[in-house]
Amino acid sequence: MQILVDADACPVKDIITKNAKKYGIPVIMIIDTSHELNDGYSTVITVDKARDSVDIKLINMVQRGDIVVTQDYGVAAMGLGKGAKVLNQNGLIYSDANIDRLLFERHLGQKIRRAGGRTGTIRKRSKENDEAFEKALLLFIKPESEGPRDLKI
């Protein structure tokens, strides 16, 4: 198991690194050339700055049982298809039970925006978001003897 992170705009890199170190899990942070990253623990892979280049690299690397952190529903769907455990930066665990709905909602939002409409606002990140993310991440990485493993949505 390893943790692969779509790290370009990921606000929880420190939380990932802290917990991965604690449990001895390798972390791969994937960024494009417009970002710099060095946390002293993670392997950082830098790809060309092009549409979806980080996403494509991540999906090409993911294996069954890996953990993927992304806020991109398309990447989440492909990660699930490859047998990965996938979550976003707010602790939402993507699953076969919710990914179709999320992809459809994204599609509807794109149609509304193309027609000149608005679909909502982005809220400021909170401490509660960080706590929810860490709790969800630990569900994936803690050994079974250390805590509950029920990931039903």
Curated annotation (Swiss-Prot):
It holds the Pfam family DUF188. InterPro entries: UPF0178. Belongs to the UPF0178 family. NCBIfam families: PRK00124.1. This is UPF0178 protein Ccel_2994.
